[in-house]
């Protein structure tokens, strides 16, 4: 259990939140069970059904509610600064695309700029796929901030979920499922509140699943285009997990079209779009890695010891120059891999992975709805999705690490099961009214938890979500703000303490070092002199930063940012004579 219940995932304060939702859910269920049935006018009602029948308008409302609803919550739940290695990697790709580049040349003295999840050779670029950074770049280009791109992708994901569910459920239940996703995922999960990913995977998965159902029923050419777009989004966001969902669905769709003897006009648009997208993807990969391989595979070959799958072999050919890289890749990242090498350890890891997904997608409020796997299996048109999820789960448990944004590709299937469970309660109420009470108690608990999360649970947990808490780099927001506010150009050499925690990354730069206001570089002394680095940027003010670590107590008054005096404990001018002394020594 210690492999997943640790710093990046659940943490003790979220056990408290788990207890809160458990008690709220039990209280709501008990209240509605004991209350007279005639007073339970909650859901569904005729007005909601009538509006949901306008399917395009329903999807549009979900999109607008996801986007502008999150904006309206900013005074209470503000966006937080990036803190995770993955986020900085995505931001690098977004910055690159915003400035019209596919990748960047390797900077001189590149060892000083090594970061996690970033390729330095043969080019300087993120290891992740291009789908999410493209959305972020769109937001950055149009509004100046990639946050808008995240909001846009999350709103599209919620709307696509509504569109997908409309192909399998009555319109009112599809709309209800999308609204649940808006509250649980768009507004209060790290999918919509960080740069860590998840929204594009939901979008791609829902497009594939929704288009497959429509192709099986009507076989319209535009549905093939939607499916091709979804496949490309999955390939460029979560390629392995996307393949687990896409392969069974694609085989099923092709089989149905052959049985129906679909004309060429049905196949051609989607096939052509898929081929064009594959060519573009291959070209991007070749520009980044020099080969037709995904950047993440090249990154693993260069930087990772732990294999991505529990049955793989470790990569012992990697050499690390810095201690934080070694500690992370050798000690931390390999923990679940080592644990899964025994049958009992593999079983424990599988259970822990399942618990984590339950914490994110279901939680106590929707646990009763998991009974929906039975009607999903019985329904002819949705049975294939349950088989697809079962197939994907075999692949999920074989991955060394499994987080919620990995499983996001299957969010549409998960919500279909949950909605089928709620719908089954509504239908079963004809025989036993207690099911109607449980249905309305479940929905009421979600409404109550919205207000609990908004006003009761502290808003300083990053990211604000139902399941996990991630790193909060001590002093990062304030020190970076101080440096960005200084006039002129600056070079900050970061010297980590011996007790440095690898999760606190300060070496985060943009697409072009020369044009940056502040460059963040690693201190390589005593193994390698910093003199060449200082001499490479003669027009910059050079600083030495020894950042705070875990256990650091921030200033008492957190309503005001640090001033220069508060930061001076960690940030000092670098000896200005170092470059000249180094030059004299060479002579």
Please describe what each predicted stretch is.
Residues 60-62, 161-185, 199-203, 217-226, ...:
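Transmembrane-helix signature of polytopic, membrane-embedded enzymes
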Residues 145-169, 206-211, 371:
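Transmembrane-helix motifs of polytopic, lipid-linked glycan transferases
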Residues 286, 423-584:
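Catalytic lumenal/periplasmic loop and adjoining terminal transmembrane helix
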Residues 90-91, 198, 237, 243, ...:
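Hydrophobic/aromatic-rich transmembrane helices and adjacent perimembrane loops
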Residues 66, 174-185, 210, 227, ...:
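Short helix- or helix-capping micro-motifs
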Residues 156-159, 250-260, 341-386, 391-393:
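Hydrophobic, aromatic-rich transmembrane alpha-helices
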Residues 222, 243-283:
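Perimembrane helix-loop-helix junctions
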Residues 58-64, 246, 250, 271-275, ...:
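Signature aromatic-anchored transmembrane alpha helix within multi-pass, membrane-resident enzymes
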């Amino acid at each position: 259990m210690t492999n997943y219940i640790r710093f990046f995932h659940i943490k003790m304060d979220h056990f408290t939140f788990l207890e809160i939702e458990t008690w709220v859910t039990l209280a709501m269920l008990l209240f509605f069970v004991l209350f007279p049935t005639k007073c339970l006018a909650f859901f569904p009602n005729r007005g909601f059904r009538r509006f949901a029948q306008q399917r395009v308008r329903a999807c549009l409302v979900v999109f607008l509610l996801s986007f502008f609803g999150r904006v309206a919550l900013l005074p209470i739940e503000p966006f937080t600064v990036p803190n995770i290695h993955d986020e900085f990697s995505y931001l690098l790709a977004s910055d690159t695309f915003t400035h019209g580049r596919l990748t960047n040349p390797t900077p001189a003295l590149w060892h000083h700029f090594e970061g996690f999840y970033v390729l330095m050779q043969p080019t300087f670029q993120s290891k992740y796929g291009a789908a999410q950074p493209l959305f972020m770049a769109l937001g950055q280009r149009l509004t100046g901030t990639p946050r808008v791109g995240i909001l846009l992708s999350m709103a599209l994901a919620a709307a696509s979920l509504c569109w997908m569910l409309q192909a399998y459920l009555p319109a009112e239940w599809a709309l209800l499922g999308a609204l649940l996703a808006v509250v649980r995922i768009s507004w209060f999960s790290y999918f919509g509140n960080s740069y860590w990913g998840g929204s594009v995977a939901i979008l791609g998965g829902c497009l594939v699943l929704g288009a497959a159902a429509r192709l099986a029923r009507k076989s319209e050419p535009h549905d093939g285009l939607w499916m091709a777009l979804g496949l490309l989004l999955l390939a460029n966001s979560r390629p392995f997990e996307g393949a687990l969902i896409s392969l069974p669905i694609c085989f099923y769709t092709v089989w149905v079209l052959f049985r129906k003897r679909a004309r060429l006009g049905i196949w051609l648009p989607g096939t052509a779009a898929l081929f064009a997208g594959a060519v573009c993807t291959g070209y991007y990969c070749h520009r980044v890695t020099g080969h037709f391989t995904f950047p993440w595979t090249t990154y693993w070959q260069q930087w990772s010891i732990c294999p991505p799958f529990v049955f793989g072999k470790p990569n012992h050919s990697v050499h690390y120059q810095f201690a934080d890289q070694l500690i992370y890749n050798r000690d931390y990242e390999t923990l679940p891999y080592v644990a899964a090498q025994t049958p009992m350890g593999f079983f424990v890891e599988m259970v822990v992975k399942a618990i984590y997904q339950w914490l994110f997608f279901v939680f106590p409020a929707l646990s009763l709805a998991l009974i929906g796997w039975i009607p999903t299996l019985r329904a002819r048109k949705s049975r294939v999705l349950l088989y697809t999820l079962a197939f994907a789960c075999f692949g999920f448990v074989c991955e060394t690490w499994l987080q919620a944004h990995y499983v996001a590709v299957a969010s549409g299937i998960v919500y279909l099961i949950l909605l089928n469970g709620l719908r089954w309660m509504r239908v079963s109420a004809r025989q036993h009214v207690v099911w109607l009470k449980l249905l309305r108690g479940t929905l009421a608990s979600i409404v109550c938890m919205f207000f609990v999360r908004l006003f009761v649970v502290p808003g300083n947990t990053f990211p604000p979500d139902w399941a996990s808490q991630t790193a909060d780099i001590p002093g990062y927001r304030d020190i970076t703000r101080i440096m960005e506010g200084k006039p002129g150009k600056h070079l900050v050499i970061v010297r980590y303490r011996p007790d440095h925690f690898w999760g606190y990354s300060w070496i985060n730069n943009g697409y072009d070092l020369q044009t940056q206001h502040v460059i963040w570089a690693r201190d390589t002394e005593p193994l390698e002199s910093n003199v060449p680095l200082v001499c490479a940027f003669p027009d910059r003010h050079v600083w030495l930063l020894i950042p705070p670590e875990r256990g650091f107590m921030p200033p008492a008054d957190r309503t005001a940012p640090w001033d220069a005096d508060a930061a001076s404990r960690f940030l000092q001018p670098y000896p200005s004579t170092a470059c000249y002394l180094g030059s004299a020594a060479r002579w």
